[in-house]
C-alpha cells in the first residue's frame, strides 16, 4: 500500500514504497533517507517487511557505489546495512556510539565517496551543493 504509517506514527500517502525498489536498484541514481524521531523504535520494527526491504535497498545501493544521502541517524542505518567501511559519517550525536564500520564525526555534514550525510535536519543545506553536483 502507498498509504503508510512511519515508525514515529506519522501517516502519509507516498508516491511509492521501498519494496518496489528491491531488485530495481539499477534504475535509480540515489536513495535519500530522511530520518527523525523514529530511530528509537527502529529496533522494535526491524523485523517488519518494510524495514527489511529498506535495509536490503540500502545495502544494494551501497554495494553498487550508488549515492546514499541522509541526515540524523541515516549514517547509522547505512552502517547497519554494511556499506560504510572506512567512510566518514556525519551523524546525530546520539547515533555516534552505534557506528561500528564507518567513522562517526562531529562534522555538521560530510561527503565521503558516495555517502552524503548530515548531523541533523538543520545541516542538510550544508551538503546540498555537493548533492546537486552529483545528481545533475
PLM segments and residue spans:
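Extended, subdomain-level signal for the structured scaffold at the beginning of enzyme domains
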Residues: 1-68, 76-88, 96-136
Amino acid at each position: 500500500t502507498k498509504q503508510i504509517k512511519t515508525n514515529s506514527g506519522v501517516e502519509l500517502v507516498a508516491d511509492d514504497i521501498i519494496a518496489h525498489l528491491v531488485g530495481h536498484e539499477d534504475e535509480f541514481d540515489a536513495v535519500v533517507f530522511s530520518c527523525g524521531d523514529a530511530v528509537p523504535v527502529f529496533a522494535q520494527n526491524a523485523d517488519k517487511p518494510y524495514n527489511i526491504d529498506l535495509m536490503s535497498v540500502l545495502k544494494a545501493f551501497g554495494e553498487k557505489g550508488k549515492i546514499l544521502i541522509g541526515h540524523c541517524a541515516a549514517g547509522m542505518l547505512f552502517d547497519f546495512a554494511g556499506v560504510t567501511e572506512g567512510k566518514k559519517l556525519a551523524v546525530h550525536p546520539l547515533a555516534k556510539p552505534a557506528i561500528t564500520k564507518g567513522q562517526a564525526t562531529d562534522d555538521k555534514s560530510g561527503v565521503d565517496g558516495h555517502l552524503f550525510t548530515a548531523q541533523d535536519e538543520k545541516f542538510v543545506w550544508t551538503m546540498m551543493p555537493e548533492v546537486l553536483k552529483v545528481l545533475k
